[in-house]
Amino acid sequence: MKRNGIVSALCFIGFLAAEAPDISVAEALVLLSILFFVPGIFPFVFRQSPVRAAQFMENGLIQCYPVAAFFAVLALVTEVGGFALIWWMYTVFNALYAILRLWETKIHRIEETSVLFGLIYLAGGGFWFFAYAAHLQIMQFGPLIILLTAVHFHYSAFLIPIFNGLLGRTIRKHRMLYSWITWVILLSPLLIALGITYSKTLDVIAVSIYMAAIYLHAFLVFTAAFRTKTGTFLIRLSSAVLMITIAFSMIYSFGVFRQEVTLTINQMIWIHGFVNAFGVILPALIGWRIEDAKPFDADSVKTFSRIYGKRKIGEEFLANIQAENNARYSGLVDDMGSLRSKDFSPEKLAPLILSFYEQTIEYNIKAKVTWSTWFRPLAIIYEWFSRRIGQIHLSTNPDWYRMYSKIKGVHSKKDGRERVRAWIRTNEKNETIFTALYSVYRSNGEGYMNISLPLPFSSMTGILKPYHHQEKLVLTSRRRKSRAGDEGIYLQTRAGTCPLPLSETFLIEAVHDNKLTAVHHMWLFGIKFLTVHYSITHINQPIERT
């Protein structure tokens, strides 16, 4: 990194000396990002992937950066546009690296997606820089507009998503608001570009939405708990200045829409360019380097099932994945002690709860499904689809009904997890309610229940953390306020894995010597939509379907 700093400083001094006294402020701004801000984000992005191909690309990008940056300077000093092609190709490889990370990552956390999208947008900046240096004619745009577009993609389109991602690594509250803000920030550069090209009205709308997102982003910055006073001051200063400069962008866009000159382009270069560089980007870079925000999943060892469903799941789905050695399991968990952590001591649970999870086949189950009022119209449609798919088939009938269950071994090599077993539950009509693939694992000293539900050409995985509460068992996917831990509900496809806006909690309680009750709550976007009550009875010979 020190080498990059020295090379960048020498290149920038050389550019200023060669161009003086007629130095283009816009050219200086784009070089400022190329020479200082691009290498400045390397610690936030690189050295964070276990994928060998990504690590190989990281090393190449770090080693090749000084050469690519040098050719970018040459392109402006010599006016040989071909030199800018080197920088463009370098940014393209950064984008390919980001796409590889997105493709290979196990969990598509919204904050990490935001960081990587910044690298993808940088490739757009590389293209517009090449277009300017090579004097390409693009639509009706003049050279200055092309250069300013390159500046835009080397600044806000590139760096704001990265800073937003770093904020996502830090905040513990308002996660839903953060997700919406992030998607606006990620999509706004495209909407603004379309507006500038095709529609002044769209441009005003896009800038307005982007401005609202930036102001809400500032709210999160000013309510976030940072580690250091210096980092807090610099990051909040950056956010405050950004609120001012984005307001000037709104004024400029509105003037273009009304065909009235409110601010000239030269004024915008100083306000939106120079001030952003030294009042927004530089403080944020220094502040985030001090904070050193790490990804939530940096130390996670979570694994996901490699088994995906077909068009129909049902009980027959298990034919291809049943264990080759016909392994037999009597419970969902071999030993509840494998889930032990500082928050969970199995010996503090009622013995009957331990018995149920370790000897599940010795219990009969009845269930009662209650959909929240607001969700009932959707539940009717959902029931129709779930019956045909044969998975997560929950009735709209509010009455109690019996569940017939059995446990079968699953081929662990095909699944990718250890000691996997399927818990199959059917109703009195012989319709499959659930086919759930159970496993347990440990990560960072904590045990988790890993439950995979095969879906058509995908799977949904619930990673549940256990807690003891008096003699009751709590299993939940809801993330802790500290954002530590692996718990959550995830959708996995061959394209990758992403968290879902779902959460669930089970509360299991022993009410008699041979009877348990369980309550299963589910939330969508934090709003409860489902409650399932279970009555679980221990008998020596459970009822089987005849």
Swiss-Prot record:
It comes from the Bacteria. The chain crosses the membrane at residues 27-46, 59-78, 83-100, 114-134, 143-163, 176-196, 204-224, 237-257, 268-288. One of its GO terms (cellular component) is plasma membrane. Disulfide bonds: none annotated. Pfam families: YndJ (PF14158). It is found in: Cell membrane. This is Uncharacterized membrane protein YndJ. It comes from Bacillus subtilis (strain 168). The gene is yndJ.
